[in-house]
Structure formats: C-alpha cells, structure tokens
C-alpha cells in the first residue's frame, strides 16, 4: 500500500532514478518528469501529494513552474525545491 504520491521533476535522469528508488523503498508511489511540459501532464494525471521540483531545467525553470501552479490555483500540495547549483538568491526567489 502506497503512503502517498510524489512527483519528482528533474532534467537529470540519474537524479530522477535515485530519488525514485529511495522513495519507492519507503512505499511511496512515484511519478517522474524530465521537464515542465511533462510535469504539467503528470500533475494533471496523478494529482501528487508532494512535488520535488528541480530549480534549473532547460525549458521552463522550476521557480517559473511553481509560480504558474500558484497563480492558477493548482498549488494544493507542498513543493520541495531542489538544485545542485543553488544560490542564496535562488533560494529566496523560490520562497516568494
């Protein structure tokens, strides 16, 4: 039995895979997306309980996607922003 649905959004396949494996070992149902287009589709299909969202992605960055979800009333779940290239400024922007 799943303990919750988590959407993992990251353009790096290795990151998606390792996060998915770790969370599936804890009985979470995981959906992955490699970019904002796939994340939008996965959100609409699976309605996740939590989103792990990469800040830096090539098409649309995670902060833009987060703001989009907030402005359209779709931000109904917690979102954890992730980045291997973060800065203080980026972290502050993600919290706005």
Residue ranges, per PLM feature:
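Acidic catalytic/metal-coordinating carboxylates
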Residues: 4, 34-38, 61-64
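Short amphipathic alpha-helix used as the core "switch/output" element in two-component signaling
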Residues: 41, 63-75, 93
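Two-component/phosphorelay signaling modules centered on CheY-like receiver
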Residues: 13-31
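Active-site beta3 strand of CheY-like receiver
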Residues: 46-52, 57
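His-Asp phosphorelay/catalytic-motif detector in bacterial-type signaling
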Residues: 3, 47-49, 73-78
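The short loop immediately C-terminal to the conserved phospho-acceptor aspartate in CheY-like receiver
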Residues: 12, 29, 55-56, 80-81
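Alpha4 helix (beta4-alpha4-beta5 surface) of REC/receiver domains from two-component response regulators
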Residues: 17, 64, 86-96
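The feature encodes the CheY-like receiver
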Residues: 16, 58, 72, 83, ...
């Amino acid at each position: 039995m799943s303990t919750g649905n988590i959407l993992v959004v990251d353009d790096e396949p290795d990151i998606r895979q390792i996060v998915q494996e770790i969370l599936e070992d804890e009985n979470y149902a995981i959906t992955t997306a490699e970019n904002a287009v796939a994340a939008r589709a996965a959100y609409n299909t699976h309605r996740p309980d939590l989103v792990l969202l990469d800040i830096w992605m090539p098409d649309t960055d995670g902060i833009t996607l987060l703001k989009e979800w907030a402005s359209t009333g779709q931000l109904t779940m917690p979102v954890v922003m992730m980045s291997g290239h973060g800065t203080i400024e980026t972290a502050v922007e993600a919290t706005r």
